[in-house]
Structures are given as C-alpha cells and as structure tokens.
C-alpha cells in the first residue's frame, strides 16, 4: 500500500514538473501597449480608430479598436488592407468592459494572455497560466489558439463567440450556447437580441428590462426528430467540384446523423464566411473573396427579407421601427395613436402613462395589426375582454394582441414594431392616458 501511494505521488509530481518546465519561448512572448498612432485606415466596420499588432495571419489580425473616445475593445478582424475592402470584426474579448489608453496585452512565459489597464487591473484573461503553454497563433480559419508542446489547444477563441460564428465555429450545449447582438454600431455593449441553441432548435430572442422573459421572434427548426442538440456548427460543405454551400449543422445526442439547415451558396470561397447576429436583430452571412477588391464582400444570406417569400420580412424584427411604429413590407409607414395613424418618423413612441390606475387610461384599437411575438409564442386562450382585463390589472403591460379566430391572447410588455396585415381578426390594443382622444383604427 505504501509503495502504491509513493508511486502515485511520483507520477503526479512528474506530470507537474513536466507542465512546470514547459514555458513560452522568449521570442514568442509579447507585451503590447495600447498607445501611439493608428494602423488601419481602410474602410472599417463601425468606423473606429484601430491599432493592430501581432499575432496575425494573412486574413486575420488582432487589434485594439474604439468607437467612443478612450474605450477600446480587443478584437479580431478579417480582411486585407491592400484590397481596399471593408475590414470586419469577428471576435471580441472584452465587450462591455472597454480598456483605456496605455492598457496592455501580455503573453508571458507562463502562457497566460492578459488584458489589463495601465494600473495593472486585469480586465480579461485566458486563464492559461502554468498549463504547459508554448505558443499562440491565429489559424487560417480565424481561430486564435493557445497551444502546448503537443499542439493541443489549451484555449481557443472559437469557444467564446460574441455575435459571430466563423466557418467551423459552434454553439455548444456544454459551453457557449448563444450569440448576443451588439447594442448599436457605435456602442459596443450587449444588445437585446440573442440566437440561442435549445434542445431541438435555434431560436432568436428579444430581451429588455421590461420583458418578464425573452420573447422568441424567429426559429430555425429541423424536420428530423431530435432528442438533444449537443452543438450547432456553421459549416462550409462542398456540394460539387466548384460549389460550396453554407449550413448550420447540428449534432444530436439521440442520433448518429447530423441535422442541417441550408443557408446560402456563395460565389466566393465559402470558407472565409461568417454568420452574425447583427445589432438590428437580423442574421446575415457575409462571404469574403481574397481575389476581389472593393467588392470583396457579399451578403449571401439574410434571415429577414422583404421579398414576401416566407412572411418573415423586417417588420418581424422587434425594433425595426425603433420605439414604436406600424410596418408593412419592411417599411415603417405609420405611427399609431388614438387620434389616428400619423406619419412615422424616429420620434414615434407609445403613449406615456402617468398612473397605473385603470381610471386614468383607456385603450385605442388597431385592427389588422400583428406583433412580432405572436408567431413563435403560443399566448393564452381566453376571450377578448378577459385578455384586456389581464393587461389592465398588470401595470407593466403596455397593450395586448388578440386573434379572434383562435381566441388567443398575448400581453405586450414591449410593443415596438407592429405589422400591418389587413386581417381584421388580428387586433392590437394600446394603453393611452385619458387626456387623449379615444379612437378605433381600422387598417
């Protein structure tokens, strides 16, 4: 027994010593200070200031960038400055936690990649210290990896997507299972939209501080019976000798076969493509050609279009009309109010209530109007008047939607974009203060 214990201790100590002896060679270590002039002046997504540095590959480069003064994000961009095409961002380390001038990015002999403020406060790190790391590099597919002496990845950027999936990158059940949109082109914080891998499908959600739970506004479903999705990967699949298709491919725990949904067939090299949940709530696939110049980028897939092929036009995106608006075929063309349909502009908003007391407000009705929430959320079965009573008793409810054919009711904690349908069995009710005029709007 004593011999076994001693032997086990010996092997444990040996493994520890081997790991401890593995260090990053001096020539592969670096310390970058966020200072000095800017490096990239080609057209750049979000119109930021950029400082690029090593490591980089032919098509990818690690950079500091900012869209507001003295607030920098550590990010990976794709594109080639020589082509004069737009450089785009495909991965970020510190969204929502920007660093200032003179911040540092350090890759030392212990193998940890650390982003810190000038005063030493750590903002982000890979937590790879003393794990046998010997190097860092960016692969041809845009995956930034930290690896050991056997070439095994100790850390990889593919495991922590933000709003983007590169070809070969996945959402995982036991890992990062969602993408989260950017708040806006100028503000790099988490936005209200997310693409989530659930047990049997991919779902687009809209979430704000007013919604009791995320509201689904689009779903990717699969015709194959699924037990539990383990992962969903953005893949480039060779269809023929000269054509490639872009798919989302899922691995199901209950089947030996993958499930797949086809997205697009780029005319360029499909392997330099990425799928992104945009700040506007749409999903787009961008494909890049290393041969083209200013036309290097193609949008090869868009989830919400205005071609009327599947009913999922841009009016189905919650904030397409910003604060409030009535939409048809992707166009925000009216601002509903209880004095009529007014012309829409960016100032359109829902009525403001001074009190939750039912005596102080009423509803105005919009016939033929639908909501982004009704298609993928079941609602409840009740009468039209009972639906209104529920909203009236709920101070957070801004209005409600009712389907007279199915007797389904949805309470609206965010109204945002309404869709004009022409179907009078669909009706929307909006709370308005009693100081304004009551009106029923037929559209």
Curated annotation (Swiss-Prot):
Disulfide bonds join 387-409, 391-397. The keyword Membrane does not apply. Glycans are attached at residues 66, 102, 258, 269, 434. InterPro entries: Bulb-type_lectin_dom, Bulb-type_lectin_dom_sf, G-type_lectin_kinases/EP1-like, Pan_app, SLSG/EP1. The lineage of its organism: Eukaryota, Viridiplantae, Streptophyta, Embryophyta, Tracheophyta. This is EP1-like glycoprotein 4. One of its GO terms (molecular function) is carbohydrate binding. Residues 1-22 form the signal peptide. It comes from Arabidopsis thaliana.
């Amino acid at each position: 027994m004593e011999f076994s214990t001693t032997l086990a201790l010996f092997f444990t100590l040996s493994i520890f010593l081997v790991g401890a002896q593995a260090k990053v060679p001096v020539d592969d270590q670096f310390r970058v200070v966020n200072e000095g002039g800017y490096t990239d002046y080609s057209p750049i997504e979000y119109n930021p200031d950029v400082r690029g540095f090593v490591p980089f590959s032919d098509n990818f480069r690690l950079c500091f960038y900012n869209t507001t003064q003295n607030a920098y994000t550590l990010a990976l961009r794709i594109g080639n400055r020589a082509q004069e095409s737009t450089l785009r961002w495909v991965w970020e380390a510190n969204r929502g936690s920007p660093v200032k001038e003179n911040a540092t990015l350090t890759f030392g002999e212990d193998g940890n990649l650390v982003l810190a403020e000038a005063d030493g406060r750590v903002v982000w790190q890979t937590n790879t210290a003393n794990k046998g790391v010997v190097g860092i590099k960016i692969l041809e597919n845009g995956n930034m990896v930290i690896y050991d002496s056997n070439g095994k990845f100790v850390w990889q950027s593919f495991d922590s997507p933000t709003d983007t999936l590169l070809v070969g990158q996945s959402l995982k059940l036991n890992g990062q299972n969602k993408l989260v949109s950017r708040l806006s082109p100028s503000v790099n914080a988490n936005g209200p939209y997310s693409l989530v891998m659930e047990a049997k499908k991919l779902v687009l959600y809209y979430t704000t501080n007013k919604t009791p739970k995320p509201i689904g506004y689009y779903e990717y479903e699969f015709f194959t019976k699924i037990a539990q999705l383990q992962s969903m990967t953005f893949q480039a699949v060779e269809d023929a000798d000269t054509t490639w298709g872009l798919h989302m491919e899922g691995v199901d725990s209950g089947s030996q076969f993958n499930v797949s949904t086809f997205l697009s067939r780029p005319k360029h090299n499909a392997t330099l493509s990425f799928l992104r949940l945009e700040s506007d709530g749409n999903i787009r696939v961008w494909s890049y050609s290393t041969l083209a110049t200013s036309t290097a980028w193609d949008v090869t897939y868009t989830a919400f279009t205005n071609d009327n092929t599947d009913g999922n036009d841009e009016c189905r995106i919650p904030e397409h009309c910003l604060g409030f608006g009535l939409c048809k075929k992707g166009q925000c063309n009216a601002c509903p109010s209880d004095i009529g349909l007014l012309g829409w502009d960016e100032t359109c908003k829902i009525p403001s209530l001074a009190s939750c007391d039912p005596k102080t407000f009423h509803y105005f009705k919009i016939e033929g109007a639908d909501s982004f929430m009704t298609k993928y959320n079941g609602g409840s079965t009740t009468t039209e008047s009972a639906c209104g009573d529920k909203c009236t008793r709920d101070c957070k409810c801004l209005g409600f939607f009712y389907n007279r054919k199915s007797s389904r009711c949805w309470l609206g904690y965010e109204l945002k974009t309404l869709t004009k349908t022409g179907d009078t069995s669909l009706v929307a009710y909006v709370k308005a203060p009693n100081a304004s005029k009551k009106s029923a709007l037929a559209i």
